[in-house]
From Swiss-Prot:
Keyword set includes Chaperone: no
MF GO annotations: DNA binding; zinc ion binding
Organism superkingdom: Bacteria
Name of the protein this chain belongs to: Recombination protein RecR
Family: Belongs to the RecR family.
Amino acid sequence: MHYPEPITKLMDSFMKLPGIGPKSAARLAFYVLDMKEDDVLDFAKALVDAKRNLSFCSVCGHITDKDPCYICSDTSRDRSVLCVVQESKDVIAMEKMRDFHGLYHVLHGTISPMDGIGPEDINIPDLLKRLQDDTIEEVILATNPNVEGEATAMYISRLLRPSGIKVTRIAHGLPVGGDLEYADEVTLSKAMEGRREV
């Protein structure tokens, strides 16, 4: 299908986003064309403002509009516990839980030798510098339960073993409301491993 050049450029821009193929890009492009001009300008401004005004916290690596971020600046948080996550969106998910009151460290990825990503390519060197502060007593490894997440957690765990800092891994298992019959073997295995006394 031949589209006018402005639509093609808009579709190409949308296809740079994850999960957006040609059909979704066309649908989004035509939706934008149907929007009021003020709404389109507000949308474009929001994109530019987000890109210009957001950066990563110099302490934890979380996305922020001020440095240090609101979490690192909060003096009421437990500074003896550090939760290591892959991405800023993981911090947001953990904060929604409202159960964790410690600090975070965002890795911005995982170790993935197949993709040429090693420990020095993610935020591990800054983690090690941060742990030189004697106030941190426990590091919780909260990377995703996939091959890369597990490899990253194992690597960090081995690095920290000589330090004497307690290193824990979040349990993985069945979601609340999930049925055993629909769970895969890895999920069931992790659920059994992560069991606790009641």
